[in-house]
Amino acid sequence: DVILHALECELNPIFQVMDLKGGCVHTKDDVIEQITKIFFYGAGCTSETSYVMRKALMKHFPKAEVEVDSDLLGAARAVCGYEPGIACILGTGANSCLYDGKKITQNIPPLGYILGDEGSGAVLGKLFLNGIFKGSLSEDIKEKYLKWSGLTYPQIIDKVYRQPLANRFLAGISLFIKENLKYYELRDLVIYNFQCFFEKNVLCYSSDSIRTLSAVGGVASAFEGELRACAEHFNYKIGKVIDAPIDGLIGYYSETV
């Protein structure tokens, strides 16, 4: 009776007017009739905004009991389960929280990739572009990236400052970095990004007894070795690291439902 499904498009109550018939969700009446519970976790689903998503889902799934929570709580449940810990999202963006095994007890605001999001793919991309164009990264890396991406300097500036979804473009550079970690400069860049994440976020949490950090996201899983090395530097242990929360959530709800 429990269906957990990742939508192919992002549904964010802050940035979208909710109309699930607008192409994001395709359903058949016979399937709708079988759904009795929906657990939805999404970015922007705070206590103030989650009613928008809940109302939209209830409209199209009238027989279902609907629970809407933040993507951060979903991540915490996926990687920590019922154990206390520090749970993180390290993907295109970054977020973190102190989790007591049931709920989020503290959250350092991530502030987005312009003001914050240390540890994220978008910030890693910013650091990389700064490095290749200002000269702190080698000319070899610069030439290799420009060939890999097929982009010129003006095109990159256009993507960052004029085109939509600049954060996704920046985060996409992580793929190049992952493929070229043989360059010590790039590994150092990844570690520096994680160090900033720890210094600006993890070390700010008030619990000295919780020293285990678990993470969800493509950046966390792609650079797990660097994340573990950074955590060890700050005297933290890394628990679970997964690319996407769905498997962890299935395990979580298998025990609760």
Task: Kindly label every feature range from the protein language model.
Residues 46-143:
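Phosphate-binding/catalytic loop of phosphoryl-transfer enzymes
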Residues 2, 41-47:
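Alpha-helical substrate-recognition element adjacent to the catalytic core
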Residues 1-38, 52-56, 60-61, 79-86, ...:
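ATP-binding/phosphotransfer module of carbohydrate and carboxylate kinases, centering on a glycine-rich
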Residues 41, 97, 178:
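Residues in well-ordered beta-strands of folded domains
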